[in-house]
Amino acid sequence: MDRQQQLRRLQGGLIVSCQAPADSPLHQPEIIAAIAVAAVQRGAVGIRLDTPEHVRAVRDRLPETPIIGLWKRTFPDSSVYITPRYVEAEAIAAAGADIVALDCTLRPRPDGEDFCQIIPRLQQELGCAVMADIDTLEAAIAAAKAGADLVGTTLYGYTEATQGQTPPGWDLLETAAQQLPNTPVICEGGIASAQAARQACDRGAFAVVVGTAITGIDLQVQAYVTALNARP
């Protein structure tokens, strides 16, 4: 299946991000895979995953489901952490991801790499589609020019350039969808209800990624407990 066929399978649908904090008991490949299977059985068109181990586990359970894979790694010389280098992207592709997600914000990467070089290598050498996780319209345009198959609003509100902003970035989504008619725009971040997911598509999203609101047990419980403990 070529890259365009993979993208068409996502159009208009829900992609569930199945991730857990590293210190969570849910951060086990077999548990993440079970969560992913449950999501697909209920209609999710794709799954977004962190780490090669989790991608591999889900691929074994869901051989036909589109997987967006990434690898979060931190480095002292860069604030980029979503698939920061080609070596991480290559490992995610080798684990079975159809689409590799990487930070395509306009920030310096570790080892001096550039997403403009990583994107074509993934497409040409490995045959993978690329989802560019961006924070601003400028970054979205740059990623599209570099050949990204998709752009996602994933990092809106999480970078220095968008500090103080709260996702979802509706204006960013709408403007990117208008200015990049040939590059599908994925809405990711801050989608906390089914109604918000539908609103994202109404505003131009090609598809919607939802994580915390569906699979984020650790963060959801913490939020409830914090609210209850704040009572006088």
Swiss-Prot record:
Gene encoding this chain?
Answer: nanE
**Under which name does UniProt file this protein?**
Putative N-acetylmannosamine-6-phosphate 2-epimerase
EC class: isomerase
Protein family = Belongs to the NanE family.
Q: Which keywords has UniProt assigned to this entry?
A: Carbohydrate metabolism, Isomerase
Lipoprotein: is it a keyword of this entry? no
Q: Which HAMAP family match?
A: ManNAc6P_epimer
Which BP terms from GO are recorded?
carbohydrate metabolic process; N-acetylmannosamine catabolic process; N-acetylneuraminate catabolic process
Q: Which reaction does it catalyse?
A: an N-acyl-D-glucosamine 6-phosphate = an N-acyl-D-mannosamine 6-phosphate
Which Gene Ontology cellular-component terms appear in the entry? Answer: cytosol
Q: In which pathway does it act?
A: Amino-sugar metabolism; N-acetylneuraminate degradation; D-fructose 6-phosphate from N-acetylneuraminate: step 3/5
The record's GO molecular-function terms, alphabetically, read: N-acylglucosamine-6-phosphate 2-epimerase activity
What this chain does, per the entry, is described as: Converts N-acetylmannosamine-6-phosphate (ManNAc-6-P) to N-acetylglucosamine-6-phosphate (GlcNAc-6-P).
> Known InterPro entries for this protein?
Aldolase_TIM (IPR013785), NanE (IPR007260), RibuloseP-bd_barrel (IPR011060)
Per the UniProt record, which residue ranges are transmembrane? none
